């Protein structure tokens, strides 16, 4: 194995995409002398961090979880959204043994099928097309009583956009000749992830016992009444639609969210016999199915089992005796550890982790530097003492300040990043180390919505930069994706990539 400079640093600038448009582009509006110099003097190009290139449906913007999973895996990791969509298209979904078993059991006992989930086209936690497919499956399996418990979005979709989704489900049930919307409630209640059990209990009691502050003849009528009360989709209060459709013993309950974090709490209320976070009036004995595995500790089957990733970058470095540091502030710590390691919580042998607390402010536009200076102090110290073969760092600023929609703060955020990158590259030059600079997805390069003129707070589908910083004569090939970053790092370290990594190095000899 050839001797390699020490260390190799992967700098992930979260939410730092590339756009030629100056409109609302915090990166082009900022003074970034370090990045400007690197773009002029170092091999660089653009790589893709969205859509099929990261295992998402075509055109779907990337996100931090997906981005880090692809960066660390060295292969395109097909996301749950894509797996479910593909299964529906192929017809496999309608034969899914876990869902079919639960539905068949309910049907043979003359019981109901309850479908619940986030009803929107946001594609972040769920997709309405999946709920349509579930209704079709229930009808195909002979169910007569099919009830939809719709959680309304307004967070990954515009604040008042649920009407078309409710109409889609009404049309679906009319076409199928069976089924109806039974309840509507905002995701604020049904999809909490911070142990706010008062909210979750409101959703649970609505679904199980039709216990509701409001009721309406149709889903759309219930929504319009909520708007009249000045409630946006996310905050729509518990509303029963039509006659009560309570959950009874022997019913099937299928939760159609594919993302786990906001589906765990409500699921636990349904399935845990020793649940103690609030007093349940009733716990019906149901055939419960999670669309994906929300947590290994939850005693319920999942329709799509979690896949495990072998020989991700962290594991392969450890197996080859290399040391590594993972470092980020709180907001992105899970991404640079758990997600970058392919969904593994524990560190690999020779892996150290540093968590820098994120600042305690209401929103990060109030402190756009976040904890980047403290993160950088630790990295510079680690480089100077040459403690690790590889350092992997995430800077949260571009994404977290980008989500605020406030342009001035976003400009300050990326200017702080430029200073931090300068400190790291200066330290590396002194010890003969190297760096790769990239991002997981875009955000801060688009702070205004061209269509509406309003603040743009979401991620983008723009490509992200890729920069090599070091002494080697290399150039960046075109067509790279996030999955190519780990193989590139192994090339720089003089290591063969494992066969599980299907990505290819982005750097080629000049």
Swiss-Prot record:
Residues annotated for substrate binding in this entry: 125, 155-156, 187, 193, 259-262, 332
Textual note on the cofactor: Binds 2 manganese ions per subunit.
An individual GO BP term: glucose catabolic process
Domain of life assignment: Bacteria
Key word Chaperone present: no
Catalytic activity entry: (2R)-2-phosphoglycerate = (2R)-3-phosphoglycerate
Keywords, sorted A to Z: Glycolysis, Isomerase, Manganese, Metal-binding
InterPro entries linked to this entry: Alkaline_phosphatase_core_sf, BPG-indep_PGM_N, Metalloenzyme, PGAM_B_sf, Pgm_bpd_ind
Signal sequence coordinates: none
Phenotypic consequence of gene deletion: Cannot use, as a sole carbon and/or energy source, a wide variety of hexoses and intermediates of hexose catabolism.
Cytoplasm keyword on record: no
Binding residue positions for Mn(2+) 1: 399, 403, 459
Catalytic residues of the enzyme: 64 (phosphoserine intermediate)
Gene Ontology terms: cellular component: cytosol
Subunit-structure text: Monomer.
Function text: Catalyzes the interconversion of 2-phosphoglycerate and 3-phosphoglycerate. Essential for the growth and pathogenicity on the host plant.
PANTHER family: 2,3-BISPHOSPHOGLYCERATE-INDEPENDENT PHOSPHOGLYCERATE MUTASE
Protein name: 2,3-bisphosphoglycerate-independent phosphoglycerate mutase
Lineage: Bacteria, Pseudomonadati, Pseudomonadota, Gammaproteobacteria, Pseudomonadales
